[in-house]
């Protein structure tokens, strides 16, 4: 249960749709990126900067970000904590 997650430069994604956040340096991930481009499922949110993370969604879309995977993961954690706080307020009434 995640909300919208900032992946840099004003771009946000639906956190619930992301299944992996990975470092783009390995050869298999470079192939995955190229395959997604050929299939029309590549979303480049780097604004021309170096790709530092690849996000893989449940719809097999590949999202490129210029933000480090650790930073994006931390934003997921912060989002989850915030949602839990909101749910706790609702439960207490």
From Swiss-Prot:
Pfam families: RemA-like
InterPro entries cross-referenced by the UniProt entry: RemA-like
Top-level taxon of the source organism: Bacteria
Family: Belongs to the RemA family.
Protein name: Putative regulatory protein Fnod_1678
Native source species: Fervidobacterium nodosum (strain ATCC 35602 / DSM 5306 / Rt17-B1)
Classification of source organism: Bacteria, Thermotogati, Thermotogota, Thermotogae, Thermotogales
